[in-house]
Amino acid sequence: MASSSPATVIVEMDEPYVQAILLRAFGKYGSLINTQTAQEHGSANSTGSSSSSRKLMHWREYEKIDWDSVHRSTSVFANAYCIRKGLIRKAQMAFNIRLYTAKHPESVLKRGVPETWIFELDDIDYLDEALMECYEVEEGMRHNEDVEDPALRQQFILKPSLTGRGAGIYVFDTRERLEELLEKEFESDDEQEDEDAEEDESGLQTSGGGMLSSCQAVSQIREWVIQRYINRPLLLKSHGERKFHIRTYVLAAGDLTVFVYRHMLALFAPHPYKQSAGDLDDHGAHLTNTCLQAKLDGFDESKAVDLFWNLDLPREKLDHIFDQICRILGDTFSAVSSESTSFQTWANCIEQFGFDFLVDEDCNAYMLEANAYPDFKQTGENLKFVVEGFMAASVATAAEKLLLDANDVSQDVQKMMDHDRNDLVEVFARKNKRSW
């Protein structure tokens, strides 16, 4: 019998796919954890303050977490950090990494992140001024004017700083193409603003932990990053020589320990990749995001996602890629956690992130971006066990470190938690961190 009243966890996720997995993961703890939906709890904003000894955890969408209660009480927990724009906002993360590598030139981030420029533009008429801050990009486009072979051109990729799910991403290699892309974005922005003014005067709507939804005009903030495009990606004959990226699930816990979940995913583009091809509008060859692929004709989930460890590569190469990913992630969290204005960790919070990596033909791994509240459903039904395993590992971490008292944990429960956390690999632990 438990020596204290059980902790309560309120699970309220918008995606039924995730909600069901979480309820099952918490349900394994039986009477040790009182798991409820928001409806069952009786109030979406309840803090459980009626019992001072009771522990309460919000496992919810970011916008639904009662941040006041999480901040006030050490016995109220959350599945997200309140401030983490330094990680999930592409421009802010690029800025933090730039600061970090200036102080730590030996860091793996000097090589493990594509060359990145922060690009801000309020009006297309000021493109010249904006490009002055991205001199190397302008030089690359000027160089390309005299290069007829697309394979020999310098290529770049434009990404909105705030959006997720592949929205608003374009590959370009000339000034003319960049202008066309930006003009289209500014036009769609104006149209969307007119619609939003009629529907909602409150401003930006968000989803996925503060990110703009993919259906919105992606340039409302008018902040992008430009990255040097990795135009020689690793291609596998067993997968039709299609470009792919690696989705890595990461758990950040407390203040601050970071774990990588070993079972990573490989997400493939639907069309074969040909470096010599000049069609940069062929998203089916260049972009690997399954949210975009689902809109294309002939989308086949079984061909879009595979297990990283099942890829047709020698084991030593897979191990080499995984080791790079772990080291890159360790230094990434070291970089962002040193900038407290844009990334603050609380001892009573944990958070799941999805990181995307690309591997080049020489098996060098590059971190592309980080996503809060990753789109777990893109894993699909065939590989659902990967999400289930990561959720079980995350729940076990929350149970052991936050929710359960040591004298309430039997040997069987401890074995279950150890088993569920077995595939978490620690990649970073902040020095002088506050205790759980």
Residue ranges with predicted function:
Residues 63-71, 298-306, 367-369:
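Active-site-adjacent bridging/hinge elements
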Residues 359-436:
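C-terminal active-site "lid" helix and adjoining low-complexity regulatory extension at the edge
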Residues 147-154, 161-350, 362-364, 394-397, ...:
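Catalytic core of tubulin tyrosine ligase-like
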Residues 15, 19, 23, 86-97, ...:
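Generic preference for well-ordered alpha-helical elements
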